[in-house]
Design a protein with these regions (language model features):
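Short, solvent-exposed beta-strand-terminating loops
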Residues: 45, 58-76, 237-240
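Flavin (primarily FAD) cofactor-binding/catalytic cores of flavoenzymes
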Residues: 1-42, 46-48, 90-208, 212-441, ...
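Glycine-rich phosphate-binding loop and adjoining beta1-alpha1-beta2 segment
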Residues: 47-61, 280
């Protein structure tokens, strides 16, 4: 009998978030795929710190783990509803958007049916001998105590380690022992009571997570006379853009277009496109305003402040009062102001990291000039095309990287490379619009030199003034962008 150390799998997946779990579900019925998936957690949990009562996911139920690749899969969200006796109630509810807790329950339902998942495995190193990778993992018991080391061998690696919470520089080394909490949104529910007990709360950042926490706290904060501030460096509290032609940017065609752009232009577009998936749902924006209107009836003065164009630049702990002294800079006026707060919630997003366990592979892993994974169009990071990435490619592939609905498409691409065939049909075109230059109207390099400025010919006059530039392009500096933070589905999807 083969042991884990001697058996050679087709795939070893590292990380079991929604994207890794989706790939595991899609690989399960394939007879020519031998896969195993490892995760350091003891079970599947999807952002437990943000399971706010009544919160919904921001994408329709079709954007589940598998449906966009295989609508007939037994692992679909509709199959989960049928199995749990909730299909007809969901139908009568007449909403495309599942409850967030329900989506987490669905993912755990899928995980329970897969025998390829290995929990309590912390990967410590990956090495390669010829064409075979060896993944070494520490195995822990339910209490986190180390039991043993295991090795798994495979021809392909799937990196689904996802993203890590980010705190602003001003908060990273703040002394918090014995005082009110300074937390990332990912830990919100664990500290909700302590936040309200601190006497005053400041939420830093914009986007869906910040908005949900503000809405969850405002009634209790007013009832308990707790000041609640919401501060963002964005010029306003951006709604998420969810129009249909904009949604076509989550398409293979736009991904091809984005991937082919120069690095500096991709960086610029990445900042400009944050409202596509890091903004606030329009319904929640309206609910917050309606709530403030309700709470202020009778001329009541609310103990809350919503401050845009305000960037956190410094923070310190005042031992004499136990409060935090926060300094902000108004980016429009270039003026600073101070606020005191008993606790702080940072809604400033997540970022991808290059896993340390890849270090033994050295130069086999492609990195860009900023030290990030240099992910190919087909989601690989080595020249052999055998190390694949899930949700670590936003800087190379754009808005499709964190999108739940695009996950099955990416998994289909990965599985086609692993199997050498197309087990799930891969759509090449889905958008009505064209991104880039249309094929039937392309002009050869240098052909513009032959054009004359007469009779409606192309105007190639240089753009010399700022007004000229702004009339042609919608460029904005980083100060006018939404704070980098997760919308709960389009980014909060640790693979």
């Amino acid at each position: 009998m083969n042991t884990p150390e001697s058996h050679i799998h087709d795939i070893v997946g590292i990380g079991i978030g929604p994207f890794g779990l989706g790939l595991a579900a899609l690989s399960d019925p394939l007879p020519d795929v031998d896969a195993v998936f490892l995760d350091q957690r003891e079970e599947f949990r999807w952002h437990p710190g943000m399971m706010i009562e009544g919160a919904t996911v921001q994408v329709p139920f079709l954007a589940d783990l598998v449906t966009m690749a295989d609508p007939t899969s037994r692992f679909s969200f509709l199959a989960f509803l049928k199995d749990s006796g909730r299909l007809y109630p969901f139908y009568i509810r007449e909403s495309f958007y599942p409850l967030r807790a329900e989506f987490d329950e669905y993912c755990r339902w899928v995980a329970a049916q897969l025998d390829t998942l290995r929990w309590n495995r912390t990967v410590t190193s990956v090495t390669r001998n010829d064409d075979i990778y060896t993944v070494t993992a520490e195995v822990a018991d339910q209490c986190g105590q180390r039991l043993r080391a295991e090795s798994y061998r495979a021809r392909h690696l799937i990196l689904g380690v996802g993203t890590e919470p980010v705190l602003p520089q001003a908060l990273q080394n703040l002394e918090t022992e014995g005082t009110g909490p300074v937390i990332h949104t990912s830990k919100y529910l664990d500290h909700r009571d302590a936040l309200l007990e601190s006497g005053s709360i400041t939420i830093v950042g914009s986007g869906q997570s910040a908005a949900e926490i503000y809405r969850d706290l405002i009634d209790d904060a007013e009832a308990r006379d707790v000041r609640l501030d919401w501060v963002t460096r964005s010029p306003r509290f951006f709604p998420m853009e969810y129009t249909k032609l904009t949604l076509e940017m989550t398409s293979p065609e736009y991904t091809d277009h984005f991937r082919a752009l120069p690095d500096d232009l991709r960086e610029q577009l990445g900042r400009e496109q944050r409202t596509l998936y890091k903004g606030i749902s329009a319904e929640l924006v309206d609910d917050i305003h309606d709530t403030l209107y309700r709470l202020s009836r009778g001329g009541r003065k609310l103990r809350t402040n919503l401050l845009a164009e305000s960037e956190l630049i410094a923070a310190d702990h005042d031992a004499s009062t136990g409060d935090y002294a926060l300094r902000f800079r108004n980016t429009a006026l270039d003026r600073c102001f101070d606020r005191r707060s008993g606790s702080v919630v940072s809604a400033t997003g997540y970022k991808s990291q290059v896993p340390a366990f890849l270090s033994p592979l050295g130069d086999e892993i492609r990195l860009d000039a900023k030290g990030r994974l240099d992910v190919s169009r087909h989601y690989t990071v080595n020249d052999a095309g055998t190390i694949h990435v899930l949700n670590g490619e936003e800087h190379t592939h754009g808005v499709t990287a964190p999108d739940l609905g695009f996950g099955p498409w990416r998994a289909s691409v990965v599985l086609s490379h692993v199997t050498g065939r197309e087990p799930y049909p891969i759509e090449k075109t889905i958008a009505f619009q064209t991104f880039g230059v249309p094929d039937d109207g392309a002009i050869d390099d240098g052909a513009l030199d032959d054009w004359a400025l007469d009779d409606g010919a192309l105007d190639t006059t240089p753009l010399n003034t700022q007004d000229d530039v702004e009339s042609h392009f919608d460029f904005a500096d980083s100060a006018s962008q939404p704070d980098s933070q997760p919308a709960d589905d389009r980014e909060m999807t640790h693979a």
